[in-house]
Amino acid sequence: MRYAFLVETYATERVKVVSVWSEFRDEDLPVRPREDDPRGRSVQEQMVHQCVSENLWFRDMLGIDVCASNTGVLKSAPALPRQETRMEFMKRYAEDSGKRLAALREKDEMWWEGNTKFFDVERSRAWVMTRRIAHTSHHRGQLMAMLRMLGRDLHSNYGPTADTGGLMQNHAPTIYAYASLEELLEGENAGGRKIALPGTGNKAVTERPE
């Protein structure tokens, strides 16, 4: 199927979202980029936005509604857990995005090429899905920057990080926190079982260290 790459990309992107969330601690949820500036979303608000906005895009633009039968979802705030803790956000997003993935796998080329409403314009569903993936990646990047501001280690999200050994050109490895989403949820529910990081090593881990 011509658009299988979009389904495959969503399958991995949803895991990357939960993986980044797993790097935070519960006490981090109220943290904003600047403590005295309410314009920047807190960690908790980023999780809320991801859950709510993805639900709205899929429901209203792609016609995929996975929250209609959820018993643990607040009616006034679709796609949100009843308790807004780090673990509950991860479980809720993993469950709902898994249902969306299953629905996407059933769609044919005609569905992907059909037009839908994107705010005030018409676009193909394939176009909307591409934008959705980029939107999610944007907010995930914001959270990764906040992890650095908090002084936290970072496992891989796409490729090497400073904590997996540094730069790609120096052959630093890609090390994910967990081997699968299932292992992630099980490990975090047990208090955390992330794969150990080797650290920065003896080479520069950024492009212009001076």
Sequence positions of predicted segments:
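Membrane-proximal, proline-rich intrinsically disordered regions
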Residues: 24-26
